[in-house]
C-alpha cells in the first residue's frame, strides 16, 4: 500500500 501520491 503506497501513500506517497496523496494529493
From Swiss-Prot:
Q: Which domain of life is it from?
A: Eukaryota
Please give the tissue specificity annotation from the record for this chain: Found in the nerve cords and a variety of ganglia particularly in the anterior regions.
Annotated transmembrane regions: none
Leader sequence range is none
Sites where Phenylalanine amide occurs are at: 7
One GO CC term, this protein? extracellular region
Carries keyword Membrane?
Answer: no
Which subcellular locations apply to this protein? Secreted
GO terms under biological process: neuropeptide signaling pathway
Task: Look up keyword Secreted and say if it applies.
Answer: yes
Keywords, sorted A to Z: Amidation, Neuropeptide, Secreted
Function summary: Has effects on muscle tension.
* The family this protein is said to belong to: Belongs to the FARP (FMRFamide related peptide) family.
Instruction: Supply the name of the protein.
Output: FMRFamide-like neuropeptide AF2
**From what organism does this protein derive?**
Panagrellus redivivus
